[in-house]
């Protein structure tokens, strides 16, 4: 027999070769005409990419590095750049000659992340003295990001606290000492920093202050 038709291929797909019996031969079904035989090149298998390394919020747009990403084998889409800490969805679609390792050929979504940066917290004062003449004082809080500010007193009968924005107001209640602890919760882009404290001493002519 003689071989003809498409006998060589490069891309994945289906091809058709032909076989024709020579003059003294015929097919087992008694025919002598060329027969078509389909042959196939399967798609090559590739693994879905994953984020390589880690990203941390820095206030600027960032894009991840990818492990297993080959521009000749797949296309990248979806969300490929982000600024805020959080999770983002990129997409990868295999080219015409490739399939995923699970055999599928559709678009895959791959999650990548930007981590929160280390938080920071500072107070404009670490100690204060309150008297009958000066019954209140304030602490100005400086923090990175938008984490909620809270403050507590370990002796609310001596000094109470309230928070408004980034200002902590301390009010004298009675003679004694107290420690004010200021905390900042994790925010959108920053982790919670370590707490800071301010020591308070209340001096009064009597043990109790009438407000």
Model-derived features: positions:
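Solvent-exposed beta-strand/loop surfaces, strongest in extracytoplasmic domains of secreted
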Residues: 1-211
């Amino acid at each position: 027999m003689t071989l003809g038709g498409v006998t060589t291929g490069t891309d994945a797909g289906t091809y058709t070769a032909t076989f024709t019996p020579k003059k003294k031969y015929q097919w087992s079904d008694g025919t002598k005409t060329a027969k078509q035989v389909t042959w196939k090149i399967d798609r090559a298998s590739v693994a879905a990419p994953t984020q390589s390394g880690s990203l941390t919020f820095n206030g600027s747009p960032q894009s991840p590095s990818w492990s297993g990403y080959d521009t000749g084998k797949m296309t990248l889409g979806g969300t490929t750049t982000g600024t805020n800490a959080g999770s983002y969805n990129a997409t990868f679609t295999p080219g015409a000659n490739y399939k995923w390792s699970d055999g599928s050929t559709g678009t895959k979504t791959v999650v990548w992340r930007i981590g929160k940066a280390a938080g920071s917290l500072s107070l404009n004062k670490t100690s204060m003295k309150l008297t009958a003449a000066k019954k209140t004082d304030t602490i100005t809080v400086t923090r990175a990001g938008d984490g909620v500010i809270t403050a507590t007193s370990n002796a609310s009968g001596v000094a109470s606290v309230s928070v408004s924005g980034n200002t902590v107001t301390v009010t004298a209640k009675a003679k004694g000492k107290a420690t004010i602890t200021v905390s900042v919760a994790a925010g959108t882009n920053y982790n919670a920093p370590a707490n800071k404290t301010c020591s308070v001493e209340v001096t009064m002519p009597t043990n109790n202050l009438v407000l």
